[in-house]
Each structure stands twice: as structure tokens, then as C-alpha cells.
């Protein structure tokens, strides 16, 4: 058993290379702090530090980095870059985020829900907003643990069909269900968890104003969450665009666990690094 008052240098002498083609506050700080607390070192590589897939192939970069590092964490746009890096690297590769998936975040979310609700199976999880990488990872993760997953997005912004189909298979096996609906009230009704994310992700800034018009009825506000259970918890992967996808009255309410959720990124990612490195 690990104790908070003790240090656990399980990664002493190990080095994590952190590749960011997409900048992030929480991902960099939580991984860099985490590897340090475990006795290792984190090395940051920004968009201009590596020639990933440009003047050097991803395969060659993976092979070279494998000679220097103990592990790689990559946060990037194309999911194929992570897959190719993992294919050719001889060291562990951790997906810090892609346009398709955000696995470290959903593991954190499941841990946070378990912490707050003391169970996962049978809970109703309502995700309101863009059918983006966060929605995809929620479908993957929550369906595997037997949660009833409701995703509410406007037409044209629903999650990837292949991912939805896989989630339905998981749900059938676990005896739960997955529902995709355009009605946010249906999704939130009697929900144990209400979750949202930004309406325009990084790289979609030019679409932001158009998206606001289409997503306004998907704002998480007091009128919407009154349909959830009284003891629901509100979650957001952050950063939040307050006044858009969520209002202060919800984000700062007693039901909100967003800052516990943010802290848990550190603990969950330490566990991931300790497991694979």
C-alpha cells in the first residue's frame, strides 16, 4: 500500500519525453510534476523542437527517441501519429490527447466518479455538447464499466459512428446502454453525472461563432441541471469557456467537482507511468 506521506521513487533514473504539438496547461504540468514525484525527469518538446513527420519520419523519430528515453507522452492532432509512434518505438508511448481520443482524461474521470459516488456500474452519465475526442473517450471508458451513457449533441456534431457502435457492444455485454440524442433534457434527466466540454476545440477557432449558434441550447445551466438527480456531480475536462458550454452557477456550485477532477489527472497519470515505465 502506498501512503501519501511517503515518497515513492519508483521511476528513479527514468526519463519521460513529452511531445506537444498541441499546447496544454494541465497535461504538461501534471505529467511533469508526476514524473518528478516518482523520481524521474520530464523533458518537454514543443511544436518547434522535433521534426515529427516533417524533415524526419515519425518512424525514425520513434526509433531515435527510444535510444534516449524511458517513455514518451504525446499530445497532438492526428491520432495516426500516436499509433505510428507506438508502432516503431521500443519504449512505452502514452496518448496525452489526439483529435480522436483523450484516454488519460477519461481514466481520471472514472477515478473521480468512483471517488465521489463509490460505484460506477449502473450510474447514468450525461455528456452534453460536441461529439469530440472527449465524447469518444467517454463512450469507450464508461461503456466498459457498465455505466448508462447518454450523449446529447446537435445534428452534424454527433460522435464517430464506429466508436458509438463499439460502445454499444460494450454496453450490451455489461447490461447497460448507450443513447445518442439531440435532446439535452432527455440526456440529463435523472443523471448522476453531467459532463460538458468546449464547443470549439483547438484548431476549430474559425468555426467558433457558427458553433455557438448551434450549441446554445446545449449550455449546461441551472435550468438544464434541475432535470438531473439532486446529488448529481458536474464535470468538465477544462479549460472551461464560462458563459458558453457552462455558466458560473453550475461550474462553481456544490455539485461541481471540476477542480478535484483536475487534481486527479496528476494521480492517475502517475499510476499510468508507474505501470508502463
Q: What is each of the regions a protein language model found here?
A:
Residues 1-2:
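Short, small-residue-biased leader/transition segments that mark boundaries at the very start
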Residues 169-249:
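Rossmann-like adenosine-cofactor binding region
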Residues 11-16, 121-123, 231:
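Phosphate-coordination loops involved in phosphoryl transfer and adenosine-cofactor binding
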Residues 92-97, 149, 258-259:
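Short hydrophobic/aromatic-enriched beta-strand-loop microsegments
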Residues 231-232, 238-277:
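Adenosine-phosphate binding glycine-rich loop
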Residues 5, 11-114, 242:
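Phosphate/diphosphate ligand-binding glycine-rich loop within oxidoreductases
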Residues 21-33, 117-196:
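Glycine-rich phosphate/diphosphate-binding loop of Rossmann-like nucleotide-binding domains
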Amino acid at each position: 500500500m502506498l501512503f501519501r506521506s511517503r515518497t515513492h521513487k519508483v521511476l528513479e533514473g527514468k526519463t519521460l519525453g513529452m511531445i506537444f504539438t498541441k499546447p496544454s496547461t494541465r497535461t504538461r504540468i501534471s505529467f511533469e510534476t508526476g514524473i518528478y514525484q516518482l523520481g524521474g525527469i520530464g523533458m518537454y518538446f514543443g511544436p518547434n523542437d522535433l521534426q515529427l513527420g516533417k524533415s524526419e519520419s515519425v518512424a525514425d523519430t520513434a526509433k531515435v527517441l527510444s535510444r534516449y528515453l524511458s517513455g514518451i507522452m504525446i499530445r497532438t492532432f492526428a491520432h495516426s501519429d500516436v499509433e505510428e509512434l507506438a508502432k516503431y518505438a521500443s519504449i512505452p508511448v502514452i496518448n496525452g490527447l489526439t483529435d480522436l481520443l483523450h484516454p488519460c482524461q477519461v481514466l481520471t474521470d472514472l477515478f473521480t466518479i468512483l471517488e465521489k459516488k463509490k460505484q460506477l456500474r449502473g450510474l447514468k452519465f450525461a455528456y452534453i455538447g460536441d461529439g469530440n475526442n472527449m465524447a469518444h473517450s467517454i463512450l469507450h471508458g464508461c461503456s466498459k464499466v457498465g455505466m448508462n451513457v447518454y450523449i446529447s449533441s446537435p445534428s452534424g456534431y454527433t460522435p464517430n459512428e464506429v466508436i458509438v457502435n463499439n460502445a454499444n457492444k460494450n454496453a450490451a455485454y455489461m447490461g447497460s446502454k448507450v443513447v445518442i440524442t439531440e435532446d439535452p433534457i432527455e440526456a440529463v434527466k435523472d443523471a448522476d453525472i453531467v459532463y460538458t466540454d468546449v464547443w470549439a476545440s483547438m484548431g476549430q477557432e474559425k468555426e467558433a461563432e457558427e458553433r455557438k449558434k448551434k450549441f446554445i441550447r446545449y449550455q449546461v445551466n441551472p435550468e438544464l441541471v434541475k432535470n438531473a438527480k439532486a446529488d448529481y456531480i458536474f464535470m468538465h475536462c477544462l479549460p472551461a469557456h464560462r458563459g458558453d458550454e457552462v455558466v458560473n452557477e453550475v461550474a462553481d456550485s456544490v455539485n461541481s467537482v471540476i477542480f478535484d477532477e483536475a487534481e486527479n489527472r496528476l494521480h492517475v497519470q502517475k499510476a499510468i507511468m508507474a505501470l508502463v515505465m
